Regions:
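Short, small/polar-rich motifs associated with maturation and membrane association
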Residues: 1-330, 334-350, 359-364, 410, ...
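Extracellular/periplasmic, surface-exposed regions of secreted and cell-surface proteins
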Residues: 114, 119, 160-161, 291, ...
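C-terminal extracellular loops and terminal segments
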Residues: 123-129, 729-733, 774-799, 846-857, ...
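Conserved small-residue
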Residues: 224-274, 526-530, 727, 746-849, ...
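Short Gly/aromatic-enriched secondary-structure transition segments
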Residues: 239-241, 457-460, 527-531, 874-877, ...
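Extracytoplasmic gating/loop element in the C-terminal half of outer-membrane beta-barrel translocons
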Residues: 269, 464-466, 549, 876-968, ...
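Glycine-rich, aromatic-lined ligand/substrate-binding cores of catalytic
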Residues: 849-882
């Protein structure tokens, strides 16, 4: 750098690299301000600034320079390459490679992006952070984690969860992954294509998420503490009728069906206005307090480094009497025994307790639980009686003709105890030797345990259908309770040898071979329901109390284990970082599969061309990176749900009576298949990475994945008895495109970093077992059978129902349109799809699918001096959701309350026909109107402001005065607002929790909460 005087208040110059070539797009900022510029195509710049100021010059891949300007100068600035940036490594399976040598589809999420979010677990923090990964928050229950999908669902009967690799330990246990304290995470790598994940073979078919936790750092001890306190509330309420509108509706209904004269008290109440206006959602929901705290100490020397942390989380649920508590500790050290020998130990223990509630379930309309009860309860009734008893319709309002089967949802919440405990441990130790330059030998041992227990107890007066008991008059004839307890452990041993060498400065080679061994064991025992003649406590310490007259049903137990081992190898080669080749091969064996197909081979290959490393690109400085990638690989899926799927099973059935003696009969219910093998995924990927002007980066990936799946196939009846056998039959295809755009539009005292991710996945069933055209047993409940359908040639999760086209308004309509059984004026008209003149199940037609057209996420970080603001937005376009819970409170069903759109939009007369989707109140043909139809179908589009966080970092001068290194205070809102057109709580619904075939059906699950928190972080 040379200085030459020139005019005042203006600095000009040129930015070059160490070869003297001008750099295009270098950022030149006046320190302490937002005043800045960038260098032009010739590397020149001009900046108006204070004569005594300082400028910062930066460019990707180069070391930032800071230059003090005393006068108006003409500057010649030479930037040196940042070797640390150029040699930045990316964690991949069983090691790490230089980022420039990556030829596969990998996304990175830094730990700092998620540690400050007030979420219950890591999965919630990943929402919207990367393309190609979908996280569906199907429940707002405290501690509940979203379902994770990497590039769609590739299996029908088996699991679709990705493989989690936690500090080198591979597991499909999502709970173990979500038990990690977010503040302990250094970074997360998401391996999306087969070439990056095939090194994990049979476990990697659904993608791989690699978690690296924080380790000890050289230096004097550093202590950090963070705490967050706040509250949660229901993000939205379902809009149901208020008391006046409800009274008008049920009086109209009973007038229409001719029964109004039987309920004079109802008319008297309406005329006098002597009734409540209870919001039952207010009664069951609350503002729930939450608290999180983490303390960490880290430090060490060149010989020994350590890191210890402890965390506590107390999260009350927005439903009464629900909560999640977690306490965790983590520790580890790393010792350099010599220049060539290293030893490391890590351990963690997590204790959690959760109180569950029953938001969903099944009754005569396949909907029960406190959510459906609260939405169905008449708003004219109080929550409590004057004597403190819970209001129960059967006990207190039988003369109003209301639904006697409805229970008070508040009593169900407060009088149930359904608790789950868990103590989980994870420990690992490794020993690493570098006998010669470039060669690393490493062996590691991991051991995890899980001790769990669940106790369920329901107060006596809540049982039975008589509903005769209450607080003041308990029904002591029965109680209900059960206990589940279990213990499992997993032992894992891995040994690798890695050789990394550079030949003639241009040939870079990284080769690795290894061996894995794993043993897993699980045991569970259940003590089933009991009925007592008294009302004792259901459980006393560790055993069921024994009461005279008690009937203790038989318990059950279950034990399973499996053994697994693997051999694998990987080679990464690049020529001068221009041309990259990567290949891997792996052979797995597992006792889960038949002896004849117990071993499986998995392999991959990938190529990359770093265009910007070519000599002819050296003068193009505005182009930071341009890389083409292509890969192909085969991975597997061993999450088949049964450790003994290939073995024959025996079941018992009806007893045969000989004289007066009943003899049980046994028969084969599952047939042996020694040929049962792995689910396999074949995936191709084409990718392109580009970065320009040190400010904009774009990553695009196209992929196609074909999955050969395991599923049960029916045995022909001529074998003597019906049954099924697990076999390798059927194929699923997923193909799509992912785009991720990262930009830094502003730098300096005011900076803005933004990342937009967009993903589109198309899913299709290619074939099924026994040449079936439709997957059997896909149902959304007994009242919704054959609504969710899965056909060959179609995506999973098609929705078939009757299509509502209006209401019968006149006698002419009754004569013109086909009827669904008996129907009258004011009932719904359904489309006669097959034109046979009758409405029945044969008129079900394709009306939607749960899978979205595309998903997106948008992350923004704004920094102005010591203030920072982070905003995360995510959502989806396309797809549908069935609001099945609404059937339980359909218009005029037992005079329960209803959705406002149905109640206020109901048919009233031939001149007031309502919204065309709601029949008249008091119809005598209720069953003909409330079956599966498009009246329950809604678009699943949504845009959610997922996270907003505002922080302030105190000035170092102030921190020094109070004796700390730094301090940050923050305020955060999680799930601030959701924009959608859905009347339920959330469109992210799933009938079977994690199902790929029965998704998109909402039975009134636990609502997602809006959470406000205030945080404090400081370091010593």
């Amino acid at each position: 750098m040379q200085g030459i005087q020139q005019g005042q208040n203006k600095v000009t110059g040129i930015v070059k690299d160490n070869a003297g070539i001008p750099i295009v797009g270098a950022t030149i900022m006046e320190k302490g301000s937002t005043n800045g510029t960038v260098s032009d195509l010739d590397g020149n710049f001009s900046l108006q600034m204070n004569s005594q100021g300082t400028i910062l010059i930066s460019y990707i891949g180069y070391i930032t320079q800071e230059i003090k300007v005393d006068k108006n100068d003409k500057l010649i600035i030479t930037l040196e390459e940042d070797t640390e940036t150029l040699d930045e490594v990316v964690v991949v399976g069983y090691g790490a490679i230089q980022k420039r040598s990556v030829s596969t589809a990998i996304s990175t999420v830094k730990g700092g992006k998620i540690s400050e979010m007030p979420t219950s677990n890591i999965s919630q923090s990943l929402v919207g952070m990367s393309s190609g990964i979908t996280l569906q928050q199907i429940s707002g229950e405290p501690g509940a984690a979203p379902a994770i999908r990497v590039r769609g669902a590739g299996s029908i009967n088996s699991g679709n969860d990705p493989l989690f690799v936690i500090d080198g330990y591979p597991t499909t246990d999502a709970e173990l992954f979500n038990n990690i304290n977010p503040a302990d995470i250094a970074d997360i790598q998401i391996l999306k294509d087969a070439a990056s994940s095939a090194i994990y073979g049979s476990k990697a078919g659904n993608g791989v998420i690699i978690v690296t936790t924080k380790q000890g750092q050289t230096g004097k001890p550093k202590v950090s503490f963070s705490t967050q306190v706040g509250w949660s509330e229901a993000q939205n309420y379902v809009d149901v009728l208020e008391a006046d509108d409800y009274m008008d509706m049920i009086i109209e209904a009973r007038t229409n069906n001719g029964s109004i004269q039987n309920f004079p008290k109802l008319i008297q109440m309406r005329e006098s206005g002597n009734y409540e206006n209870t919001n039952w959602q207010d009664a069951i929901f609350r503002n729930a307090l939450n608290y999180r705290g983490t303390a960490t100490i880290t430090g060490g020397t060149e010989i020994l480094k350590y890191n210890f942390s402890a965390n506590y989380q107390n999260e009350d649920g927005i439903l009464l009497n629900s909560f999640y508590k977690r306490v965790g500790i983590k520790g580890g050290f790393e010792a350099n025994l010599s220049k060539k020998i290293k030893l490391g130990v890590n351990f963690s223990t997590t204790y959690s307790k959760r109180r569950l509630q029953q938001p969903t379930g099944g009754n005569t309309e396949d909907v029960t639980g406190v959510i459906a009860q609260a939405l169905s309860m008449p708003p004219i009734l109080p929550v409590y009686q004057n004597n403190g008893d819970y209001t129960q319709i059967a006990q207190h309002y039988a003369d109003l003709g209301l639904n006697n089967q409805l229970r008070n949802p508040v009593s169900n919440l407060l009088e149930n105890r359904n608790d789950k405990w868990s103590i989980r441990t994870m420990s690992n130790a490794y020993f690493e030797v570098k006998p010669i330059k470039g060669l690393t030998l490493r062996t590691s041992v991991n051991f995890t345990t899980n001790a769990a227990k669940q106790d369920y107890y329901q107060s006596a007066f809540l049982l039975g259908k008589s509903y005769t008991g209450n607080k003041s008059t308990p029904d002591l004839t029965s109680i209900d309770g059960y206990r589940l307890s279990g213990f499992g452990y997993n032992a894992y041993w891995s040994t690798t040898a890695t050789y990394d060498v550079t030949l003639k400065e241009k040939h870079h080679l990284n080769a690795m071979i290894g061996y894995d061994f794993e043993y897993n064991s699980d045991f569970e025992v259940q003590q089933d329901d009991r009925t007592d003649s008294d009302n004792p406590i259901a459980y006393n310490n560790t055993s069921i109390t024994n009461v005279n007259g008690a009937k203790l049903w038989t318990g059950s137990s279950e034990y399973s284990n499996y053994v697994f081992d693997a051999m694998f190898a990987r080679l990464v080669y690049d020529y001068n970082y221009k041309y990259v080749f990567s290949g891997s091969v792996r052979r797995d064996r597992s006792s889960k599969f038949g002896p004849d197909k117990r071993a499986g081979w998995f392999y991959s290959g990938s190529l990359a061309w770093n265009i910007t490393e070519e000599d002819f690109m050296k003068d193009i400085h505005w182009l930071d990176i341009a890389k083409l990638r292509a890969s192909y690989g085969i991975t597997g899926n061993d999450q088949i749900g049964n450790d003994y799927a290939w073995i024959s099973t025996i079941s018992s059935d009806q007893n045969v009576v000989f004289g007066t003696t009943a003899i049980p009969t046994y028969y084969p219910s599952g047939y042996s298949n020694r040929q049962l093998g792995w689910e396999k995924n074949k995936q191709m990927d084409l990718g392109f990475d580009i970065g320009v002007f040190n400010a904009l980066n774009i990553v695009v990936d196209l992929y196609k994945r074909t999955s050969d799946i395991v599923m049960p196939a029916n045995i022909p009846n001529f074998n003597g008895i019906a049954g099924s056998v697990y076999m390798n039959a059927g194929q699923i295809e997923n193909k799509g495109i992912e785009i991720q755009v990262s930009a830094t539009p502003f730098k300096g005292d005011f900076s803005w970093e933004t990342t937009l991710s967009w993903s589109k996945n198309n899913n299709k069933i290619l074939s099924l077992a026994n040449n079936q055209n439709q997957l059997a047993n896909a149902s959304a409940g007994t009242k919704w059978g054959n609504v969710m359908r899965n056909y060959v040639g179609r995506p999973m999760g098609d929705m078939y129902m009757l299509k509502v086209i209006g209401t019968f308004n006149t006698e002419k309509d009754l004569a013109q349109y086909a009827k669904n059984g008996t129907q009258d004026i004011g009932d719904l008209i359904f489309e006669d799809y097959n034109k046979d003149g009758t409405i029945d199940v044969n008129d079900y037609q394709l009306v939607g699918n749960y899978q979205p057209d595309f998903t997106f996420g948008w992350n923004n970080t704004f920094i102005y001096k010591d203030f920072d603001l982070a905003v995360t937005i995510d959502g989806q376009c396309g797809g549908n959701v069935i609001y099945a819970a609404a059937r339980a409170f359909s218009l005029n069903r037992y005079d329960d309350n209803v959705l406002a759109e149905s109640g206020l939009g109901r048919w009233k007369s031939s001149t007031d026909t309502g919204n065309g989707m709601s029949h008249k109140a008091g119809t005598n043909n209720l069953g003909s109107n409330i079956g599966p139809s498009t009246r329950y179908l809604y678009d699943a589009d949504f845009l959610r402001i997922r996270n907003v966080s505002l922080g302030y970092t105190l000035p170092k001068k102030f921190c020094k005065i109070i004796g700390i290194e730094n301090m940050r205070i923050s305020a955060n809102v999680q799930n601030l607002w959701t924009f959608d057109k859905y009347p339920g709580y959330s469109v992210e619904a799933n009938y079977e929790g994690n199902s790929a075939t029965n998704n998109g059906v909402d039975f009134g699950g636990y609502p997602i909460s809006r959470t406000f928190t205030f945080g404090l972080n400081f370091n010593f």
